[in-house]
Amino acid sequence: MGPCAGGAVYSPALTDFIIMTKGTSYMFVTGPSVVKTVTNEEVSSEELGGADTHMSKSGVSHFAGENELDTINKLKTLISYLPQNCEEIPANLPYELNNEERPSLDTIVPENPNQPYDIKDVISNLSDENSFFEVQSEHAENIVVGFARLAGRSIGIIANQPAVLAGVLDVNASKKGARFVRFCDAFNIPLLVIEDVPGFLPGTDQEWNGIISNGAKLLYAFCEATVPRITVITRKAYGGAYDVMNSKHIGADMNFAWPSAEIAVMGAKGAAEIIFKKEIKSSKNPIKKLKEKEEEYANLFANPYNAASRGYIDEVVIPSSTRKKLIKAFKISENKKVTAPKKKHGNIPL
């Protein structure tokens, strides 16, 4: 709620979650005066280490309260999703099953595969009413993580956000997702992954900042997790990003897909340009030939049925019935036990 500087700032950094209060909380290793002396850079305490800075830029803070009361209320909400310790499971709230169909989900994904939509609308329809509690809401917004309840059961949600950068995975999104997955696994909180990912963000900036090792953090976190892990693919599931986002190939317990799902190495146009490159180049009308091959590839792979026939998808579900399927899936997997090999600890690619 107040300032924290110097060596003392590593104390909150070691905790599971940090909640700051806007206007009064500051965190930095070296304060504005030292920064001015060493680098001649003038910066205020708020700009250097205030709540807004650590919520959006650094991602150090997980929540920010408008005032002290709001901060305390956020803490209470957070604790309500957690067990007392790592040897217990979170308490289930009373819930009576009713009509769990959600008709609005049937029209939530646009027909145009390149048109964005807000994944939080999907989350709010799948989870219990007003139960989603987002973590790091202003940092790496192309991935959404947070706690929710499903028929009273506490779960962790990791979802790609098509409304931001088309939902791609980048360095910050990978780190954000990996940390949340590991926390949920540490405290026996089941995981729901909602996937619409076109791939990893390309470019020199990402490569030079270690997208390989950072993307591997998310992969490692999912592979290491022993809690129930269930995935719903709403639209795109392309390439390595598909594998990383809790696919069957890395041990997911159940994978569902909507009819709009596209599970492939890449999008139809990009794949057609590579696979049929010679044929397109030698054609009298390359543009027309590309279009034909794009449609051919899309008909074969821009659907979930080919993947389902290979066992990568357990069931293709109607969007409106997804919540009902998830309630049953988490109930079935609630007694999941995994015997891990004896070791001191794993070596996540930090």
What are the residue ranges of the model-derived segments?
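Ligand-binding clefts of soluble mixed alpha/beta catalytic domains
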Residues: 1-350
